[in-house]
Amino acid sequence: MNVADLLSHLETLLSSKIFQDYGPNGLQVGDPQTPVKKIAVAVTADLETIKQAVAAEANVLIVHHGIFWKGMPYPITGMIHKRIQLLIEHNIQLIAYHLPLDAHPTLGNNWRVALDLNWHDLKPFGSSLPYLGVQGSFSPIDIDSFIDLLSQYYQAPLKGSALGGPSRVSSAALISGGAYRELSSAATSQVDCFITGNFDEPAWSTALESNINFLAFGHTATEKVGPKSLAEHLKSEFPISTTFIDTANPF
């Protein structure tokens, strides 16, 4: 199997062309005719991740956050140059899937959580189309116990919260990463909790005034889910060594 074959499989799986994304999905650096020898999957194509891909002897690196984004300057200098240089020196092909790996209904950063935690009455959630998030219901649980459950799932501590909702919860909406602005949409949906990665000042008063619990577990922690699920999927689909790289980014 070469990189072009892998890309064909990923495109069929993730349907990237239906998304208006913030950067290019698919092959960002490399040659599509390169044979796939070993695959590494990670959250972000930063220098540490690329170094670990080199150490793992992977020649394909699939990430959620690639190198190129809309509005970037054209010159390849500084940290971007260092990343690309290391990829090329070690013949690592870089593939990125951003919003498609948020929104996927079984492998994505959002739906995978809801499925793993046995939420029911699941439906798409968010203010953009295609919808990126998910909302659903579950057996009533104290908010502190719900936070502990999510912390164990994400293997990360709660980074920020504004507990404006009920102390006993049975519904939630979830969009991973930097989606704290979707808190208002969650309040409109009348769920008890909104779960995301990042937070900022407006989330505090919005949660308290909208009678909803806001929970942030970190951008990276909430966006490991999809890449990990994708790595497991590729292991089951192809007889090619596949590994997940975790740089332990606490943000």
Curated annotation (Swiss-Prot):
Domain of life: Bacteria
Keywords: Metal-binding
Coiled coil (residue ranges): none
Annotated residues for binding of a divalent metal cation 1: H64, D102, E223
Any GO MF annotation of the entry: metal ion binding
SUPFAM superfamilies: NIF3 (NGG1p interacting factor 3)-like
InterPro entries with a match to the protein in the record: DUF34/NIF3, DUF34/NIF3_sf
Residues that hold a divalent metal cation 2 according to the record: H65, H219, E223
Subunit structure comment from the entry: Homohexamer.
NCBIfam families the UniProt entry points to: YbgI_SA1388
Protein family according to the UniProt entry: Belongs to the GTP cyclohydrolase I type 2/NIF3 family.
Name assigned to this protein: GTP cyclohydrolase 1 type 2 homolog
Protein species of origin: Chlamydia pneumoniae (Chlamydophila pneumoniae)
